[in-house]
Amino acid sequence: MTRSLDLAGRTALVTGAAQGIGLSMVRELLGRGARVVLVDRDEATLKKAAGTLDSSAIFVAVADVTDRDAMADVVTRSSEDFGPIDVVVANAGITPPPATIRTSNLAEFDRVMAVNLTGALNTIHPTLDGIVERRGHIVVVSSAAAFSPGLGGSAYMASKAAVEQVGRALRLELAHTGATVTVAYYGFVDTELARDTLDRDPLGARVGELLPWPMNRRVSPEHAAAVTVRAIERRAPRVVTPRLWGAYSASRDREPGDRRVDRAEPHGAHPHR
């Protein structure tokens, strides 16, 4: 499947859109001529971000991705203003303070899974019928943490490994419809979230010191967003940045299903409306 996706005139929904990678993603999408639905639970930061953007091309929604009904309502309301959603970027996520499994607060573990995994499902599920009808595209933001074992971050790593599998399953399940899925794997992105975890926390800083260069190199949110939006346009099945992490990921064998999807052609005709 090699069809490209022209983002001009399309509607994209991005969660975690108030700052960091999410806000950079919004700007990239707007730059391609898309309309964008910005979703975040931080109302003040979201409104501040929205004030820097073209108000005619955005729809701003304050919602928590863990609230299933609220996310379904966002999809309904934004579709009434902008039309059906063509692209979904399930980006919202949190990183807990570093802790070993033995010392972890299991309630914190549950919270990470609720935001990172269930939040992604709550974002994607209400859009799926429209995505299939319009042969749209979904991005699930996983992480290099999904395939890199390490200490002090089991909750985050487990959540991102689960998100990866959601994305890979969706790609297989939607292949016959013409809708497509990208799984995004980021290494270290220079956001406040990363600084809190790796710079300001003693255990996180120690873990960071154990990583050799260039595995510990950080990329900017703008870079992560740019390579991801290019992946959307190409309908790429995965995007990995920094690229070195791709070699690490490639050590895992490709599934036979991946090869079948690469050759698949969509059934029926669902022209873009």
Task: Identify the role of each PLM range.
Residues 143:
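Residue(s) in the substrate-gating loop at a strand-loop-helix junction
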Residues 99-101, 105-110, 121, 135:
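Substrate-binding pocket helix/loop in short-chain dehydrogenase/reductase
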Residues 43-44, 62-73, 106:
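The beta1-alpha1 cofactor-binding region of Rossmann-like NAD(H)/NADP(H)-dependent oxidoreductases
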Residues 3-35:
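Canonical Rossmann dinucleotide-binding motif of NAD(H)/NADP(H)-dependent dehydrogenases/reductases
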Residues 172, 176-243:
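SDR active-site lid
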